[in-house]
Every structure is written in structure tokens, then in C-alpha cells.
């Protein structure tokens, strides 16, 4: 038993070294042969050639996080402070080979990966631009090394409009990534804030898929024994959805395909309470910001079922709010297991076609390149 543990540790170290080589290759300072060799162990053990699954079983995972090594190493204190209640090994030992192993366990054909909280923005635009570029090139190199297994929602320094515009162009036009990943708020500003309008207008022009993941809000409070993300993540998602709706951003940017994490936070449970806030607006204002009504805007957005699928009451609220066509499978790896959400989804009494839609068909409408 001890010997097997040692073998596993050796594999993780070797694969992790491979990721460092991957970053170097992505930056153009390492040979292609070095990149292939570095990730060979992850490919061999992770089954990079494909997933054996029944015709209705394989899935697309749209909520799957990565931890590029230099980013993780140099920002470890920030990551720990943000995620202190989560197992440190999830980010300190993360490697592409491990990710593929987890994907194969749940018949996940492809994962569209993203950065997670705390993200790349710490009130330093130049630093954020550097981290966005490095993380995005890491994801692009990983996708190239494991064809068909990975996509990416690119990181951008959202509070820096000029830097964001440059990184959007590079990520989508040069790296050919699958969309953009945003956090729910930056320095206390939700996504509907006017400071972000120009960047969202550009994403609307590009008809971009935009994955939105929660972060710690500016106004949480500590409860002894309770990890702040357990409550505040869902709340910040709800807050940013409301801000996008009531700022008129949803109406102004109808071509952005927003994907909100964890079934939209607490919004499905309090939707009528939030919808009641329309009484605070004049009719002419509502006609501009919510021409189709509040709930109509929510119904056309997309939501992944990470975490919420493990809560039958929460999942029931999601299914009551939005049609099945708007739901994606998401594992929340490496913090959630790929198999937990898959098992919970299979246990719901939904028609087989609906299960298949959530597993992959809905995602394939937005990301058809993963159909092959």
C-alpha cells in the first residue's frame, strides 16, 4: 500500500514537471519535443486518446479549473487566503494528467477549463495582463497537447479595459480559445457596473461565450466554522446576475452567451423576491433595461449544475426557473469530483433526452468542435 502511494506521488511530480515545461513551451522558450515528453506521462495514464462510454453517457464539463504552476507558486498565499477551507492539494498538486484521469472516471470527453477565485486581478494592471497571458497560453498549450480533451475560457484583466481588449483579441483570434472567463465581481463591482460596459460590449460584438464564476464579495461576514465561500459565492453570483439584469446589460448585450456557475447561485430560490424590485423603476426605465421582463432574461441565460445538482431542492428550483436546454454539466474539479455531479444527475427523474442534453448536447450547441 505504501509502495503504491509512492508510485502515485512520483507520477504527480513527473506530471507537474511536465506542466512547467508546458508553460515554457507556451512561451516559446522550450522545444516541441520537450513539451511532448513532459506531458507523455499524463497522456499515457490519463487516456488522452478518448473516453470509452456508452452512446448517451459521455459528457462535456464546462466548470473545470486549472492551476498553472508558476501562477500557483507565486500567488499561493492569495490562493490559500481565498480558499483556506479547501484542500490545498487540489491546487498545489494539480496537473493535466490528473485532470484527465478524473475526466475519464466520469466519461467526460472534454473539459472547458477556467481560472477560479481569486483570479488574476489584484489592483495591478500590468501584473494582471501578465498573468492572463501566461494562464491563457498554458491552457492553449494543454489543449494542443491533448487534442479534443480541453478547451478554455480565457482569463482577462476586466478592470483594465485596454488590457482586456488586447487579451480578448489574443485569446479568441490567436489562441482560438472557446470563450472568456470572468469572476462575479472585481473590487466590489458586480459585472453590470458601468466600469465594465465597454468590455462587455466587445464580448457582445463577438457573440462570445462568457463563463462567470463566483468570488468573495466585498461585504461578506465571518461565521465561526463556516467557510465564507459556502455562503458568499452563491450570493455573489446572485448579486452579479441582478446587476446584469437591472443595469440593462442583458438587454444591451443579447449576444453574449453567459454561463453562470452553480445553477445561478441563490437566484432560482429568490427569483420572485428579486423580480419584485422592478417596482423601483419607472415604466420607461423598465422598457429600456428589461424589455422582456426580469425572469425572461434569466430563462435565456445558461447555467452549469456544479454543486447545485447535489442539492435536490436547489436543482428543483433551477429546473423550475429555466428550461433544460440552458443547463450544462459542470464538475467544479479539482474541488468537486467529476463523478459526484454525474451520479446526481443520473439519479434525477428526468427523461433520458434531458439527461443527455445536460450531459453534452446543450454544450455542443455552443461548442460544436467537441462533437467529433
Please provide the spans of the model-predicted regions.
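Active-site-adjacent C-terminal substructures of enzyme catalytic domains
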Residues: 234-236, 255, 280-338
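Active-site region of glycoside hydrolase catalytic domains
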Residues: 246-257
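Hydrophobic faces of well-ordered beta-strands that scaffold small-molecule active sites
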Residues: 60-64, 111-113, 152-154, 180-182, ...
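Active-site gating loops and adjacent loop-to-helix segments of metal-dependent hydrolytic enzymes
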Residues: 68-94, 217-237, 274-301
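Active-site gating/metal-coordination segments in enzymes
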Residues: 109, 113-247
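Acidic-and-aromatic substrate-binding clefts and catalytic sites of carbohydrate-active enzymes
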Residues: 89-93, 120-121, 158-164, 187-194, ...
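Catalytic metal-binding/acid-base residues of hydrolase active sites
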Residues: 65, 215-216, 264, 309, ...
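Mid-to-C-terminal alpha-helical segments outside catalytic/metal-binding sites
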Residues: 2-39, 48-58, 62, 68-110, ...
